[in-house]
């Protein structure tokens, strides 16, 4: 809501500065976004009267004028504006004046004619008004008056960002009421008396949807001069509120909306066939709107119609064929209360957003319509003339809102505010806000005023008391609470440690949406029904994810399309698994996932560029697993996964259970996602790896370590990791490490077999190992793998 400070002060004028005013209303919950001057910086500009206006003898487009600015002599001024004419009241920049941009007015000669000043346009004075030529002031503008004072240009516009619950402040009336409450100042509304009817013309009003329109007022005004000029004071008030002047009738309805908070509309009476009918639209009924667009109406849209056709979308937008035009003689003024539930969302469904719909869908004061009708009639007669008919009203009292009655407990107020405000102050604040207050045993019973739709529960009253009392007036008091030491579980592996490790290995953390495209998800996790959202952001984000892999693959595609071929990403997040036995039928499992694609390392002149493969990702994942309590107990077993390459996929195993998966993305999936090149992913259950070994101090052996390499021939289908793990178990305390360093298949190795070269590191903490000790340990290892896997030492 943008408004003029000077207009507000016509209603309520507390003894505070502009800065104090904006701070005050911000602290009261009406956040001020911006404060701007209504005009540029200038001085020396006066109201003038063009006494003479003649053609310049040497220039077709210039006029020579004599202008009265209230001084002893008339000023000779040369003007190039086409609308300059004798008798016009104008804004005159006299010699010595300074205009915006530090432009100084001096005596000059234009084509040989003296010019001692300048006749100004709006733009030349930094006033944001679209116009051609110089300003045309009202005939009663006082000659010689300082122009800044004449238009009250020592003013600012204040832009307030109103929350959806404060619809009562979408008007000068509402803002003045709020400022008056904050300052205990009287609010003076303009005097509006009932306009006496001079003709008896009426129109029938048939409200067929009383729940949507409990009150509808109509009044005929005949012989209206729509060619009249909107007074400059009204144009300025509209401009400072962000609304441009259109014609006097529209300007008046806009003015009443801004001043009173009641949207209104004016119809051309000659274009109405029969009477007014307020009804729901027929499905696909068509209406041409004021902007020339055609709307195909839905059956839940309330319309204002006559006996033959729809005239306007109620509370939203008028129709082109019933609006006021330059040929209009008689008008029908409309003033109604539309139920917010029947207006909310209608404008948006037709791609519209209007000042009227914004107010009606939040709630307009349902006691305001008669006063607003009289105010609009008063202004219309003053500006455009006309013969006024009586007001015709159609009302359904049963469908009008009922004032909310809300109980406020003393105990609840003190608990939420943390401060005891005296009873008398609480009552005074609520009454200043327009509420009727009754004292009860536990506190108070307050009846909300007709303009406050947002007062519905006890907390609303607490908020009102708190903000008017002033949150800054509530003393600071530190909460008193016992400090309990939280137990620190050293065995828990911090997520930050894993994040740091992956970042150190060249990964970047990604955060993708938990909402995914359901059909695409079926490619990654087929055969599992995901939770479908009843009200999704979009169709592409309508399912809860079953895996983090989908989001990471889409992120890879996003980066590849932006010339980022090397991608290394990881993500920690939840997956959502339907489970009838779980709370709310859904298991939320924390997962850790990663993806790599592109070159193995950054491009370098001294390094060969190679593409990542399965073992790059496996190495990174093993580094993560090494941090955990079972770092040596994890294994990788070949598996089949619908999203992964059939020959390059493995299940991550621990204690005989699969806790994750790693592998190269299936070529068909690469094609459907639009991936460019080989992409490797992993996903693992976080709860299965989030423990670590508690560090224990131990002596470091001072005796030498011994390495022995063995080559074992085993069946080709036996996993290398199983062989290495068997070596570790059989080696006992002397075996410090066992590492696979070569796999050979070919000449010298029987077909269907493979040779595994394993480095064994043996060491004792008590003594130097003898050759016999080493040989015995190696022999025990060979016998163990031979018995378990049929392995044999390679010759």
Swiss-Prot record:
Mg(2+) binds at residues 454, 460, 463-464. One of its GO terms (molecular function) is ATP binding. Keywords: Aminoacyl-tRNA synthetase, ATP-binding, Cytoplasm, Ligase, Magnesium, Metal-binding, Nucleotide-binding, Protein biosynthesis, RNA-binding, tRNA-binding. One of its GO terms (biological process) is phenylalanyl-tRNA aminoacylation. Its cofactor is Mg(2+). The keyword Calcium does not apply. The keyword Nucleotide-binding applies. It comes from the Bacteria. Residues 39-148 form the tRNA-binding domain. It catalyses: tRNA(Phe) + L-phenylalanine + ATP = L-phenylalanyl-tRNA(Phe) + AMP + diphosphate + H(+). Residues 401-476 form the B5 domain. It is an enzyme of class 6 (ligase). It is found in: Cytoplasm. Pfam families: B3_4 (PF03483), B5 (PF03484), FDX-ACB (PF03147), tRNA_bind (PF01588), tRNA_synthFbeta (PF17759). Residues 701-794 form the FDX-ACB domain. Its EC number is 6.1.1.20. Binds 2 magnesium ions per tetramer. One of its GO terms (cellular component) is phenylalanine-tRNA ligase complex. Signal peptide: none annotated. Disulfide bonds: none annotated. Belongs to the phenylalanyl-tRNA synthetase beta subunit family. Type 1 subfamily. Tetramer of two alpha and two beta subunits. This is Phenylalanine--tRNA ligase beta subunit. It comes from Vibrio cholerae serotype O1 (strain ATCC 39315 / El Tor Inaba N16961). The lineage of its organism: Bacteria, Pseudomonadati, Pseudomonadota, Gammaproteobacteria, Vibrionales.
